[in-house]
Amino acid sequence: FQAEDEIAAICSAIGASYAGSLGVTSSSGPGIALKGEAMGLAIMTELPLVIVNSQRGGPSTGLPTKTEQSDLYQAVYGRNGDAPMPVISARSPGDAFECAIEAVRIAVQYMTPVILLTDGYIANAAEPWAVPDLTTYEAFPVEFLTEVPEGGFKPYGRDENLKRPWVKPGTPGLLHR
């Protein structure tokens, strides 16, 4: 999906997560700054989301073809209202594959947005690496609440991982009134 701007892109990804699919969006520093308020929305609504930041050089539009690793503070602290978010950083193109899997695992296991940092070099580079056997990875199944639990539905109830239930809109018996 090609959105008209950065804000629409992240809001569409949040909508995908709200509907029961994992939303993913990407940009670089200036675009990540524009996505900041919506990141806070995803944190507040406890929706899984992966945000990829391919860092580039300079402030503002800067040097779009120059790589730089200067967005760490933006990734860690770049939201208002004490809105913490896990941040993962890839060290190579092959590592980006592993980091993406970890970002998805954290996002769905803890119902939170995750930032995946990369840079222009990693985003444009290639390296030989064997695609791993995915059956060797530990599964992290996504579980949706499909029926009203005993004692009623508590949207902000927590499990042993402090995760709230993920409910698809329109699930019978789990509708907001």
Question: Language-model features: where?
Answer:
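Flexible, low-complexity linker and terminal segments
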Residues: 99-177
